[in-house]
Amino acid sequence: MSEPQPDLEPPQHGLYMLFLLVLVFFLMGLVGFMICHVLKKKGYRCRTSRGSEPDDAQLQPPEDDDMNEDTVERIVRCIIQNEANAEALKEMLGDSEGEGTVQLSSVDATSSLQDGAPSHHHTVHLGSAAPCLHCSRSKRPPLVRQGRSKEGKSRPRTGETTVFSVGRFRVTHIEKRYGLHEHRDGSPTDRSWGSGGGQDPGGGQGSGGGQPKAGMPAMERLPPERPQPQVLASPPVQNGGLRDSSLTPRALEGNPRASAEPTLRAGGRGPSPGLPTQEANGQPSKPDTSDHQVSLPQGAGSM
């Protein structure tokens, strides 16, 4: 009779269970790690024990201060904490301050007067051993106490008006000066007089007042006009209303001044502006009965 063979299935089943347990623990650890990572992103902290809580609480406030601090504040704090930088900063502040005095209480005033320094508020600086900036400044020799701010101040020039000043920056208003302007040839002329009014810089009006100046046209150098005999204007031309050169009397041809000034008036009425009228000579004026009337001068009657 054959003997029954032993069953080998239980060892294989145990091996499979071992691999299954390892896989389950691996998956649980992976899931726990992912949960901690997600909670850490949301702001939670995953701890393995309670002993680390006080240490984390002590480290948390400095981190908040560093996050709230600005870069400039950190630089200033580092500069002030250094004693050498604090002394240099104190010297700079002492040189740049002006001569301002502040009223103090009676106790501070008496103590400062006994020391020989003016009344002031006592100042305290970080990182410096000096009790007061003004007290240490008063102990310096007088040559050192002179501020450098006075050297930078410049005297105001003539014609400048200071609008406002901030520190060493000033805004000034400069008044414009109107004087004599020179031509290219070097002769000074005043541009304040213009064409209005007909006045020249010599004080004359028109062509008859004052001496003509050098460089003026030739017509302004003519002598003043003399009174001429009573001569009425020649009859105007029918089509244009202007005097014809062929009808001009011969007596006027000898006077270049009278012939150079043509007379224009409506209808040919009234005497010429360059000749004296009858009213100027004291004779009563007669009514003009004809619009076209020509009177020759006294010497031209015999011609």
Swiss-Prot record:
Residues 46-67, 132-303 are annotated as: Disordered. Induces activation of MAPK14/p38 cascade, when overexpressed. Induces apoptosis, when overexpressed. The gene is RELL2. Primarily expressed in spleen, thymus, testis, peripheral blood leukocytes, brain and placenta. Not detected in prostate, ovary, small intestine, colon, heart, lung, liver, skeletal muscle, kidney and pancreas. Keywords: Cell membrane, Membrane, Phosphoprotein, Transmembrane, Transmembrane helix. Interacts with RELT, RELL1 and OXSR1. Interacts with PLSCR1. Interacts with TRAF2. The keyword Metal-binding does not apply. GO terms for cellular component: basement membrane; plasma membrane. It is a single-pass membrane protein. One of its GO terms (molecular function) is collagen binding. Residues 194-212 have a biased composition (Gly residues). The chain crosses the membrane at residues 15-35. The lineage of its organism: Eukaryota, Metazoa, Chordata, Craniata, Vertebrata. It comes from Homo sapiens. PANTHER family: RELT-LIKE PROTEIN 2, RELT-LIKE PROTEIN 2 RELL2. Residues 148-158, 172-188 have a biased composition (Basic and acidic residues). It is found in: Cell membrane. Phosphorylated in vitro by OXSR1. Residues 278-296 have a biased composition (Polar residues). This is RELT-like protein 2.
